[in-house]
């Protein structure tokens, strides 16, 4: 254990300020970051890592992008926080509306974290419908509000574990539309909203089966429940209009975060006006935040989104993904090792199971011990994947061919080592 991590453990629970950073799922001592640039970070022991976590998907342009850094420095001279509406918020809202192609009947509310945004989405759904129940899907992560932490391992101190006659949250298997439809036929009149990730990223990368997302949204329309699409991970990453554009759907409520802030804390809820105007001060549903719409986060976010709009940006990401992951897929296929590499855009996950998972139960069939050995080998070679078998890893536009070639070789060698192919 490093001296700095020992010191961190004196001050922070587990030495971290967010649990997965402790790297216990992969059984390593977590690195303490000293600095970062482009696709790499350097730890306190002066070891360089190629970063495929990227602040959990926030850094699609890599660390310390010069345009984002310059904008933040310039903005800082005008103030770091106002507690008032600023020009930066308005300019950023205009940028987002233009980027997403939103109609004029939409509105946005800025916040600081994804958890705040999903919590606000649920408050809107319950407040407008007057209904108590929220439906989510097993393995999908929507932040640490009690409403979302019904199942293990998160439920230990959740409100939902209390002995309530009627649970306020129902968790159903992802991709099981017949079961979802059965539940909605029975309880739809009590369901305020259904929240879902269009592409799961917190049980590894799991894709929706054809028709699942469309069916969920259509069923919500039929029952008067709100469809809440959590695009904290997929928004601004998988396409210009996010997953909603790729699947050609219009959920009632959209939630964004991560890339939205350009590396600083920012999130947003986007809805049609007739929904958003129920929020205070226009309506009676309360939501507030001291740092909501922080001017520096708005500045960084505007530059981040503007960079995503550059000609060929998503084509470049797709090329990076193809060149990096296809040879690894080929190695897995030709050797017959029991591993499945799932990728979607610039997200990817290794499941140590020969079968592609469709839900949390499938994902949990992964050989965790084998994943840990694979992870530890890659880590020792200076390749930093997201440190859990149930988290997505991420590519960025900053990943150079040199770094990708090195990491590709390191990952293939690590797979060979785990399965004694060398």
Curated annotation (Swiss-Prot):
Cellular localisation: Cytoplasm
Coiled coil: none
Domain of life: Bacteria
A GO term, aspect molecular function: glutamate-1-semialdehyde 2,1-aminomutase activity
One protein family per Pfam: Aminotran_3
Known EC number: 5.4.3.8
Protein name, UniProt field: Glutamate-1-semialdehyde 2,1-aminomutase
Organism: Chlamydia trachomatis serovar A (strain ATCC VR-571B / DSM 19440 / HAR-13)
